[in-house]
């Protein structure tokens, strides 16, 4: 790979990534860059040879890095990008701010971003994937984002420019989202915190939160998140079609579809990325054979497989 530009942050060669993902799997990145701030990131990308690929990585909550690793520069934002500021009904959050922290701080100020409380990950990932639950989505409250392009240009994009859909945005490949601005509805702080406490209790009762998981494995075939309402039928939920295919609790190596929630894949202790991805593909095949439905991955899979996979 070409000679790397000088940086003020941290630039590490051949950095293993498994400890940076919630599933604790994956090979090394050629380089891992943790910029000090927006200027450091912009300058690095502007001087990085154009033939060098980059991969913006959040906190690794919805990600499988394959066992062969990534032949690129992985960019991971840290403390210089986790600020949360509130003015009136506007919440400005750095891309590295955790969704749960943003929800709690907004609630303290009497602002309702409670749907973010149980979403694993950081604001950058929430925007890029239009994360949502309980019938609310990031797109509902997003105003604009700050983005650093692959060529180092710092720009501001309106929410509409991202064309946010179900678990989808049109944010350019290699672009790094650094900050998001939300317009949040007002609410009573005590009521908002009580709602989040209830949401956490419901999540912990139905999802394997104490195991190594990456959140939902597949997108709902219905094309929307669970709302939690009594009229929200299950026929086109990913977990339901997985159950119908007999794949709840299915195993491959150290990977397992959770007994607690069949759309959650867990690392039982010694799974490889190949185990996890292979189990997911087996589930997809069984579901298709059972129902004719092709499940789409919600977990992102990146990198190279080992030759033995």
From Swiss-Prot:
Example of a GO MF term? FAD binding
Q: Does the keyword Glycosyltransferase apply?
A: no
Give the main localization category.
cytoplasm
Catalytic residues, per the record, are 167, 216 (proton donor), 298
Where is this gene product found?
Cytoplasm
Q: InterPro entries per the record?
A: FAD-bd_PCMH (IPR016166), FAD-bd_PCMH-like_sf (IPR036318), FAD-bd_PCMH_sub1 (IPR016167), FAD-bd_PCMH_sub2 (IPR016169), MurB (IPR003170), MurB_C (IPR011601), MurB_C_sf (IPR036635), Oxid_FAD_bind_N (IPR006094)
Q: Which ranges carry the FAD-binding PCMH-type domain?
A: 24-187
Comp. bias regions, Basic and acidic residues: 200-213
Signal peptide bounds: none
Using the UniProt record, name the top-level EC class of this enzyme in a single word.
Answer: oxidoreductase
Spans of biased composition, class Polar residues? 214-228
Which reactions are catalysed by this chain? UDP-N-acetyl-alpha-D-muramate + NADP(+) = UDP-N-acetyl-3-O-(1-carboxyvinyl)-alpha-D-glucosamine + NADPH + H(+)
Tell me where on the tree of life, at the top rank, the source sits: Bacteria
Record EC number? 1.3.1.98
Q: Which family does it belong to?
A: Belongs to the MurB family.
Instruction: Show the NCBIfam families listed in the entry.
Output: murB, PRK13905.1
Protein name as catalogued = UDP-N-acetylenolpyruvoylglucosamine reductase
Record organism: Roseobacter denitrificans (strain ATCC 33942 / OCh 114) (Erythrobacter sp. (strain OCh 114))
Name the gene for this chain.
murB
């Amino acid at each position: 790979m070409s000679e790397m530009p000088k940086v003020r942050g941290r630039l590490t060669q051949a950095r293993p990534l498994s400890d940076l993902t919630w599933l604790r799997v994956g090979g090394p990145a050629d380089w891992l860059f943790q910029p000090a701030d927006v200027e450091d990131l912009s300058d690095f990308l502007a001087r990085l040879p154009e033939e060098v690929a980059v991969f913006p990585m959040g906190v690794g909550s919805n990600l499988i890095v394959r066992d062969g690793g990534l032949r690129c520069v992985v960019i991971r934002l840290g403390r210089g990008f986790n600020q949360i500021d509130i003015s009136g009904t506007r919440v400005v959050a750095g891309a590295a701010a955790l969704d749960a922290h943003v929800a709690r701080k907004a609630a303290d100020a009497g602002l309702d971003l409670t749907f973010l409380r149980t979403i694993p990950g950081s604001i950058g990932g929430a925007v890029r994937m239009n994360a949502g639950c309980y019938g609310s989505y990031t797109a509902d409250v997003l105003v604009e984002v700050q983005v650093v392009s692959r060529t180092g240009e710092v720009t501001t994009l309106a929410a509409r420019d991202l064309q946010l859909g179900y678990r989808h945005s049109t944010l350019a490949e290699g672009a790094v989202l650094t900050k998001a601005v939300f317009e949040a509805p007002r609410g009573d702080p005590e009521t908002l915190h009580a709602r989040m406490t209830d949401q956490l209790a419901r999540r912990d009762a139905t999802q394997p939160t104490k195991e190594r998981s990456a959140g939902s494995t597949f997108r709902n075939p219905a094309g929307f998140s669970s709302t939690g309402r009594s009229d929200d039928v299950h026929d086109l939920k990913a977990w339901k079609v997985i159950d119908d295919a007999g794949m709840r609790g299915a195993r491959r190596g150290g990977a397992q579809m959770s007994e607690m929630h069949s759309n959650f894949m867990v690392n039982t202790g010694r799974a490889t990325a190949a185990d996890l991805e292979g189990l997911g593909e087996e589930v997809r095949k069984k579901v298709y054979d059972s129902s004719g439905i092709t499940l789409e991955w919600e977990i992102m899979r990146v990198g190279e497989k080992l030759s033995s996979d």
